[in-house]
């Protein structure tokens, strides 16, 4: 499910009533794909993740345990000094519009930093 344009993966457990718990090891940011190994016989799954700073990674997991990476695409740059954060802009009508920022860790957000801004219009229609 998406929550403020961030993927959220939950495990549903039946204990008298349905309970929703976050999937252990699901990343905070980025794209997440999950596929059951054998949904009728096990709690095992394959998890594919990627984000602005992390190459696509395939992991194997068992519900309730940290997934184990199996294979990753190569990294094309050193992301160790960078971080992803989410912020919200307010439109003229008061709607909160989420956006992500990739910046140096600990960057002072004082309005004086050079910025490369990219936007996507949605519905497969890019900004022009």
Report residues per predicted region:
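Peripheral, non-catalytic segments that deliver or gate enzyme domains
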Residues: 1-118, 122-128
């Amino acid at each position: 499910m998406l929550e403020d344009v961030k993927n959220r993966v939950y495990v549903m457990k039946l204990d008298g009533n349905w309970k929703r718990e976050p999937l252990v090891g699901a990343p905070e940011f980025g794209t997440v794909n999950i596929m059951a190994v054998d949904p009728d016989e096990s709690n095992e799954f394959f998890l594919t993740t990627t984000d602005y700073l992390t190459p696509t990674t395939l992991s194997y997991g068992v519900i309730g345990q940290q997934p184990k990476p199996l294979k990753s695409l190569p990294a094309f740059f050193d992301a160790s000094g960078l971080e992803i954060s989410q912020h919200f802009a307010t439109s003229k009508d008061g709607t909160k519009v989420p956006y992500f920022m990739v910046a140096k860790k600990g960057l002072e957000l004082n309005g004086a930093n050079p910025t490369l801004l990219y936007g996507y219009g949605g519905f497969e229609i890019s900004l022009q």
